[in-house]
Amino acid sequence: MPIIYTTPVSRADGADVVLLPTDLSVATGTPSLTNCTEGTPEAGFPDEIAPQPQDYVFLKRRPSAFYGTGVAELLRLLNRSDLVIGGGATNRGVETSVREAFSMDLDTVVVRECCWGGTPRPTPTASTRR
């Protein structure tokens, strides 16, 4: 099974960060939620889950693992339609990616134990709502 990583990154000058009209930080010009700066250690992965040479790594500039990354194209080339997903910012990146995968008719499983948010408390997500 191929292992695919995505990591959210932005340019150092922030020129590729989107400020939404509903974002309270629009007035200041500083986004409230930022990605890691491309090329810095923060944009990498912890040693425990670091990519191996045979794994695939894609940079992403939006919440989805698919938008503008090449992940969908790789899955087609590998003739894969099943996904197992885990990741950070569960209520943003994981949920967005799962919804897009569903729209692309990909069979998707989210491993709850492999998902995390930015706070010590569990982040309510679609997977925990009833």
Describe the predicted segments one by one.
Residues 5-15, 19-21:
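Catalytic-core segment of enzymes that process non-peptidic bonds
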Residues 1-8, 111:
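Short beta-strand segments at enzyme active-site cores
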Residues 16-18, 22-130:
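Active-site-adjacent betaalpha module
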